[in-house]
Amino acid sequence: MRKCYVKEFHKLISYSEGIEIQQKAFDFVIRNNIDGILLLLQHKPVITIGKSGGKNNILASKYELDKYSIDLCHTSRGGNVTYHGPGQLVGYPILNLNNFQKDIHLYLRQLELILINTVREYGIKAGIKPKYTGVWVGDRKIAAIGVGIRKWITRHGFAINISVNKEHFKLIVPCGIKEFGVCSLEDFTANVDYNDVVQKIENNFKMIFETDLIKEETVDNLFERSNLNLRIT
């Protein structure tokens, strides 16, 4: 059985901190030839521009971004423009696909399946939309996916809306798609618990990738012994 480590962060993480954490985890996976590390967190409000994105899909002025304390960052992930913020669970799987299957399209479908299964556990009919990535409920996207892969090790990942401020999505053209909107779990289910979503994501991750997940205390001990500090102060 494969073995991955999972690190949950319990405070809001800036996007730049998230990039730094991913790079540390990426280097750790290479150096120790482990199967992977799953990072789970919530970001401080940020608009990110992927490789295929452009500022033409940002509708907000600098004044508006400053008013709402929203950062703007270019990123190496695939995809267009998206928003991250509180009430949205972001997952960064740093997986060594050399130990799984070296197939980028399969990897994307596996991420979609994790998210679809999780959303459906709340009684919500979620699925994919032909020609588009991510997970959808009707014509509204509930979870986005954007990845990067180097040396067959993955970076970036997915974001699932739980109780995110959807007004902030009005500041952009999400993923460059004008004709469709976004939604959150809370639109369909009252009182969704963030930690419950985390647990469901972890369970589906284990099932889809056929791996054990080693939890936080062991992870911190392992990283500290290896001089890898993923703690945010």
From Swiss-Prot:
A Pfam family this chain is assigned to: LplA-B_cat
The record's PROSITE patterns line, in alphabetical order, gives:
BPL_LPL_CATALYTIC (PS51733), LIPB (PS01313)
EC number(s) on file: 2.3.1.181
Gene3D superfamilies per the UniProt record, alphabetical: Bira Bifunctional Protein, Domain 2
Location of the BPL/LPL catalytic domain? 32-213
Keyword Transferase on this protein? yes
Q: Where in the cell is it found?
A: Cytoplasm
The pathway this protein participates in, as annotated, is: Protein modification; protein lipoylation via endogenous pathway; protein N(6)-(lipoyl)lysine from octanoyl-[acyl-carrier-protein]: step 1/2
Positions of the record's site feature: Lowers pKa of active site Cys = K141
The entry's keywords: Acyltransferase, Cytoplasm, Transferase
Q: Where on the tree of life does the source sit, at the highest rank?
A: Bacteria
Q: Which reaction does it catalyse?
A: octanoyl-[ACP] + L-lysyl-[protein] = N(6)-octanoyl-L-lysyl-[protein] + holo-[ACP] + H(+)
One Gene Ontology BP term is:
protein modification process
Query: Which residues constitute the catalytic centre?
Result: C175 (acyl-thioester intermediate)
Family annotation (InterPro entries): aa-tRNA-synth_II/BPL/LPL, BPL_LPL_catalytic, Octanoyltransferase, Octanoyltransferase_CS
Which residues are substrate-binding? R77, G78, G79, N80, V81, T82, Y83, H84, A144, I145, G146, G157, F158, A159
Molecular function terms, GO-annotated: lipoyl(octanoyl) transferase activity
One Gene Ontology term, aspect cellular component: cytoplasm
| SUPFAM superfamilies per the UniProt record, alphabetical | Class II aaRS and biotin synthetases
Record's miscellaneous remark: In the reaction, the free carboxyl group of octanoic acid is attached via an amide linkage to the epsilon-amino group of a specific lysine residue of lipoyl domains of lipoate-dependent enzymes.
Q: Which PANTHER family match?
A: LIPOYLTRANSFERASE 2, MITOCHONDRIAL-RELATED, OCTANOYLTRANSFERASE
Q: What does this protein do?
A: Catalyzes the transfer of endogenously produced octanoic acid from octanoyl-acyl-carrier-protein onto the lipoyl domains of lipoate-dependent enzymes. Lipoyl-ACP can also act as a substrate although octanoyl-ACP is likely to be the physiological substrate.
Which family does the UniProt entry place this protein in? Belongs to the LipB family.
Q: What name goes with this protein?
A: Octanoyltransferase
Q: From which lineage does this chain's organism come?
A: Bacteria, Bacillati, Bacillota, Clostridia, Eubacteriales
The gene coding this protein: lipB
